[in-house]
Amino acid sequence: MMLYGAIFGCVEAAVTIAAAMSCRNPFVAPFDKRDVADEARRTFALALSDHLTLLKAFDGWRLARGCGSRAEREYIRDHFLSRQTLVMVEEMRKQFRGLLRDIGFIESSGGGGSGGGGYGYGRNNNNNSNSSSGGGRGGEGAGAGGAVEHSSNVNGGNIQLIKAVVCAGLYPNVAVAPAALCPSATGNAPGKGPKGGKGGGGGAGGGKTAGEVSLVGRKGAMFLHPMTVNFDKKELDSRYGVYHEVVKTSKVYVRDMTTVTPLMLALFGGSLQVHHEKQAITVDKWLHFRAERRAATLVKYLRVHMERLLLRKITHPQEDVSSNGRDIIQASNLQA
């Protein structure tokens, strides 16, 4: 995830999300205030993604902290956040950023911690943006660890690109929702669903929320945990989601999810097969998507080009491949 974030110019978001997944959830829910805490957490809901929601909450905390200790205390109190966990995420970010710098994937522009390539949420976030809850600082840099070079974070506000990078980091953890939950989504119709069933998704979906229907994972049925931002959604923008953690009780629950498109899965997922005669593509022999011949050929070309780009960056870390990354973003329409 972080390597792709550096290549495609959204390294700050990638590093923050990776750090947050390495720590416990910063949201707290006191037993006697669970409903209030849940409502506070949902004010950060962004782009049908728990990972972007965490990113937005963390970003808001850094902004509040910059306004003084009182503002920080009020922010943490009002949004039911753990300062200790947020500090842990910040420290983990510094470590991850240092590792990327050590292997040559990013450069320190020198100087202090402001004025670097910040990230914000001012565009391409038409799903539950809630900008009043702290998203979009836009100008803050890498903090005490040294400012990140602007080219490494030039696409820090591109929500779709960040979701694609999350997809790259979390695959093969994929959950498929019923088609009825995504009536207005485009490009979501598979040739046949996972397990070979018509449409996949394992539930009726019509009139129900995402938390009331079963999803299909590679190892069977699973359900959204009530803490996910998509739990009460009656419509999703895509049938497909990637997740980091599951918990098994009476059922298998997905603790976090980011909706992703078939294109993201085709570009950043597993083994890709193109079936021109069926006008379809298959990812890892279980995710099936319709694709016209021209589109399928383009996806295959972009996939090969992207894998070569990653290999080139790994073997020649000092080489600037940002222009190549921009070409892929433009060709795949992962633009803000």
Residue ranges with predicted function:
Residues 1-296, 300:
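Second RecA-like catalytic domain
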